Each structure stands twice: as C-alpha cells, then as structure tokens.
C-alpha cells in the first residue's frame, strides 16, 4: 500500500480548522455539552489530540529532520487557532446563552484539553521519527488504542472510573453529577506532561539515529508505558481486584457468596445479617430464573458513597459486572440494592456477548429483568408503582423505551418502573424461559411470537385493570425528578453544593448561605434551596428564610422535592410563631399523602403543637439522642405509631439505643391500621439489625393482621418469609 500523502494538500490545516469549528458548533447544541464544562472539555480534548497529531505529521512530512521545537514553531499559529476555537465557542455559549458559571469550565479546559493538544503533537512527532511509512495510519491506531484503554480497565478491573492521557478523567456513570478538579487529576496530568515532554526530547535525540537505535527506544517507551499501567493501582489511578480487596480489608464467605467489605463496618450482627441476606436473595433469584449453577457471587460492600467513589468510581450508582460475577454496593443501601444487582449477575448465565448481558446492550432489557425479579419498589411490588404512574398520566411508549438508549431519556425511576413492570407481566404470562430467551436475543417476535406493539397493548390493558387508589402526589414523589440532561448547570451546581455543604458542616453558616444563594440563583436546585434555608435558620434569619421559601416553593410544585419543602416551611412558620399557617400546611401535607413517612412527620408536628409549641421549637435544634428520649416520653401513656419509624431512624447508629426501643415496643404493638402495621414492619427490620430474630418474627407476624392494602401485604409476607428463613438457619 502506498501512503496517502496529505502533505501535498496545502489546504489540510484549513480542513482541520473548519472541522473543529463545525464540530464545536454542533457540540453546543447537545445537552451537557452546550456550556463550558467538564463534558465540553473532554470532547475537545479528544478532538484536539487528533487534530494536533495529524497536523504535526502533515508538517513533519515537509521537514523530515525538523526538531520538535522547529515543528512547534512552524505550526504554532494553527495550534493557537485550534485551541482558541473551542475556547471561544464554549465561552460565548456560556456567557450569552447560559447562566452557568464558567470558572469550572476554564479549569477543566486548561487541565484536560490544552495538555491533550500537546500530547497529540508529541505522539505525532514520535511516530514521524520512528516510522517512515503509514504515519497517519499508525497515529490513528495509536490514538484509538490510547482512547480505548479504559475499555480494558472497565472489563477486567473492578472499577468504573478512568484516568486517560487524552481525556484526563471519567467518573463512570451519569448519576454522579459532582465532578471536580481533584488532586488525583492534577497529579495524573503532571505525570502525563512529564512523560510526553521526555518523549519529545527522545524524538529529537532519535532524529539522526539508526533504525536499530530507534527500535530499541520504541521498545523502552512501550516498557515504561506498561510499567506505568501496572503501578496505576498503587497511585490510585486505577483499581485492581487485589488492590480493592486490600483497601476494603475484611471478608466473609457464605454458601453462595464471597463478600469483601470495608473494615469501617464494625457491627458483627449486621455483618452476619449481610451474609445471610446474600444467600437468601441468591436462592430467591436462582429459583425464579430457574438456574442450576451454584457458582459463588463476589460482592464488594463499601462503607459509604464516598468510599465507593474513591475506590470504584461511582458514588450514587450500585453496580454489577455480570461478566466478572461481581457486585459493588455501599453498606447504607445494600438491603435495597442487593437483590437487584444479584439478578444482573446470575442472568449472566444466559446473557450474550463478552459482557454477558443483552445482545444489543439495551438498558431497558437489562434493568427490566432485574426490576421484575427484584419486584420491590419502595416496599411495594413494581406493578403498584407502574399503576400509580399510569393513573397519573405519567406514561411511556414501550416501543420507544425498548429502542436503543431511550431508557436514559426519562427520569430514571420512570424507565426502571415501566421496564420492570412490563418484564414482570411477561414472566407471569409467558414464562421465565421465553423471557430469558428474549434477554439474550432482543427479538420479541422470536421469543413471544408477538411484536412489541401487541405485547404493549396487552400490558397496558392489564395495568389499567389493577385496582389501586389513585394518588397523584405519590406519583409526583416517585417520578417528579429531572434527568441530568434537563437540569441547569448540573456539574457546576453539584461541585459548588458540595463546597457549600462543607461550609455548613463546619459551622461556617455565613459562607454556606452565600454559596447556596449563588447556586440557587443560577441552578434553582432543591439542594441549594434547602441548604440556603437551613443556613438562614442557623443564623437566626428566620423571617428572611420564611419569606424566601414561601415565595420559591411554588417553583417545585409537581416535583419530588415539594413535600420536603412543605415540611421545612411548616417548621419555619412554627419558629416564627405562625402556628395557624404551619398547621394549615401540615394538614395539606397529610391530605396529599405522598408517602407515609411525610404523613408521620406531619402528625408528629401536630401532636407536639397540641402538647407544647415552645418545646417543638427547641426540638428542631435537639441532638438525635434528645429527640429520641423526647419522643419516647410521648409514648409512655399511649402508643403513637406515627412516631415509631422516626424514632428507629434516629436510633440506627446506636445499637444499644435501637435495642431498647425495639424491646420497649415489643409487647405494646397492636396492629389495627396502616400506621401501626407500618410501625411493626419497621420494628421487625430493626430487630433483624440487632440480631433479635425471634422478636423480628413476632413483629412480622403481627403485621399480617392488616390486610386492607393487598400490595403492601405481599411485602409483609415476603418480610416474614425472610425472617423465617433466618430463624431456620440459626
């Protein structure tokens, strides 16, 4: 093959310049890329690495023995234009068409994008020195190899985050909105700069050397690159199986699982329960999927979201890697997420491709099966949540949902619930074997002998006939959020909110007030509004907090955050001696009934208003232990079941206190309505945590006397099944 000589095309730099201009004009019309931010900088780092490398080869072909600095001087004007175009377009887009702050974008651009252009030049020059033919092809192969190294790390390593010479850093999922310039990113970029600077000197050194010398240095460069890849885990730029096990520090082996968990998790009874829950869910999922394998699942349990972010990459998302037979969950959410992630892992036995999932990598199929087998959304079967959405007018087109990556076009709970409910319908009506076949081949006609339209019509007829009381406020609570693509300045807001929260936790309320106010002015997020109001209250600016919140709360009507804000506003009214306004708001919240937890909190406040308004004002500032004692005192004469879940929530970090609370209510619980049933359900869960399995069973049995809610009754039955299984195991 004869190399295509781009050096003879004098307009080549103009072509690249035009391409950069055109691509950036397209980028600013794409969600998450339309402002000067992290994603915009990453996209342009890839573009400028490629452009600067190609330009270097084009120029070097005309001046074959030119030094690195000579090449830089000859193309410096083009390079300035290359780097300026994205900078100018991104900056103008942010300044004239957005209210987002540009500071973060500037920092990312100079730490991620500008170095990438330099690395492209060095790579292009080094290739010109080492190779005499096929330079463009070799550069493109090198570019793709460097760019897609993270695919290998993602596949083989227990991690989601990536450090890469071209795009710097990627956190792994879209669910973590906060991405900031960390010390790790800066140190990684400095090492990149050192390496590519040395490579530039090596290129100059090799200009007049013989072929054998060049080959030796090429080998040395490749060896150094390999060494760096191997030591990345020690530098915290990647995570391997062994490094993750070492960092977590503890392990537990059960019949069906090998669990590696954080050494910060100390409670032996909770660790024991964690192991039993792994085996119970394993057997449940295996039976429903009709699987025969007895292979052990490897589970990594992180102490909290922050540890998960540091070691694994994703703080918010719990993840399974079916092809590795591994699950990654934080301790605070494992009871909710474990069964779901276990479905992903066990489904690998009938999955397709190297990733052991759906053939087309369709997230609606992958998550739909997991939701259907888990069949628990906020302690209700998944059909319940789907019906709540359906009756409230929150609907999806299944044909669209199961096409490509449209799963991510909706707020996440909408996609998860509908995909899960639809799969649950398919399992119940067509059998698990046909669903497993579809999971593998993604062909409705082959698996079910019907197309998606016919199956969708069947499913929605089924859903419409379910007898569930319509509750639009519950629908808003469940489904009233926004995807990251529809939020205003999500990256900047998340990063600044984290800083503001740090000020708040350190007691610097003046600074937190200023920063939360700034964030709310451009992003109008719930987190910034809540933080601002709480900061104002800490500064005793209660009237200002009331005025601001009563005006701004209207903007959140219809969102999942509205009910939290109603509670907060009622508290502000109470502090400002506006009892009538507070009671009116609490009555409204009870009537809306978005969730029993909100109703419980409203009833607690109404009871305390009747008893002692001044004590209630003090209650808001009490420590957890004092709140527990005060609420327990209120239960001495009569049991107020609406207080029990909150008492248990306050007690969860103190096992001794939790045990005393459980024992106090042990002989007093009488289930006669939903409030007492829900309290009993929470008490049975708490008894499990402290290792009192007999008491857990007593509470669970009592809850079954409440049968007015057939969907919640299924949850109560499942709760008792698990507790019986634990007791039998003991």
Language model features by range: what are they?
Residues 21-60:
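Long, hydrophobic alpha-helical segments
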Residues 30-40, 85-108, 140-188:
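Membrane-interfacial interhelical loops
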Residues 39-40, 244-362, 373, 380-381, ...:
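Juxtacatalytic substrate-recognition/specificity segment
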Residues 61, 68-93, 467-469:
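Selective transmembrane-helix segments that form parts of the transport pathway or gating/packing helices
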Residues 143-146, 185, 314-315, 337, ...:
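Acidic/His/Gly-enriched intrinsically disordered linker/tail segments
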